[in-house]
Amino acid sequence: MRAFFSSIVAISSLLAFTAEAATPAAIEAELKRRASKKTQEQPEEGATARFIVPDQQRARTTAETVYNTWRLSLIRGSEQAWRSTTSNSRQMKIRNLIVSQRGSFPRDFFRETQEAPKLENFAYVGALQGCNGYTMACTYLGKMQLGNDKAAENAFVLEFVFEGGRWKLDQTRFFNLTKLPDVRKRLRERDLTILQEQDGFQPYDRIPTTPPACNSPVLIGKVFVDCPGRCIEMAINGISLHEFDDERRADIISGGLKRGVNTISYKIIDRDGMERPGMAIGIFVAPETEGNTPVCVFDHILDQSDKAEGGTFSFTIQNEHIASMNPRFTGTRPQPYHAVPLKSKP
């Protein structure tokens, strides 16, 4: 078992924060993380899917009109313009993420918004449509500096859905092409087949489902998953939906947690042809008082010799769990609910 799994404290150290309203940058990072992952893989030779190749000039005009209106709505703080150009699903996901951290939506979304890139700085590559013409992905190419990294050539992908009689932006993605020279070369040549081969450039195969609006949380919660070689589909309290794919990530729990009984259900799917070492799932109550620490209330920890099975579980958050978050707590620290018995250290 990897050292990470030997102590749940290692997980909680990643979540030690004082909860506050999410900034737009944090929101975008949370929403894009999963989308950007698969494009870092090289495509399988000859692998294509069925997509519509639309009239490129018309698709480009549509995409840039919607994107530029959306971009200006963020700069000007125009909620009406933002809603008219943003998909219903994305609006609700952003709203739930902010509300689940006791933020105020849409105020906190616009308060610290960062300026989105200008399309004039990128070269248009091409567009594909999916879902019988109700989804569209437009790919651009250009240099971009992300974080503290040096400026590098990136693919910039805009994902749209057609709803309410108009095209709306659902999300944007950046992919660093430094380690993908063949992909970069084919994008420069405006080779539309690369867009069909790489799923990161592809349109959605279905309209994203709009999640239900969550209430402000009783307790702010986070779920942490480390699932190498596996895909995990999860629902917490029947409201917060998550999907983890061969990755290590922490998500805010939509609607949070509550004192008393909570539920979690998940399905674990092995990824073909991949090694499957140990995995871990942990649910934490996040501290809202400076100096307090997270407390784990549920875990599912396995090593590589165990068969990973999902299920539906109920776990109870007691007053002692909350009290133990205070560093001055002197009582017996309550244990999290273990989905499977913990193994003794060798």
Q: Over which residues does each language-model region extend?
A:
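Hydrophobic, helix-prone linear segments
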Residues: 1-125
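Surface-exposed, charged secondary-structure patches
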Residues: 102-157
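Short, intrinsically disordered/low-complexity patches at protein termini
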Residues: 104-108, 116-118, 191-194, 257, ...
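Exposed aromatic-hydrophobic patches
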Residues: 249-261
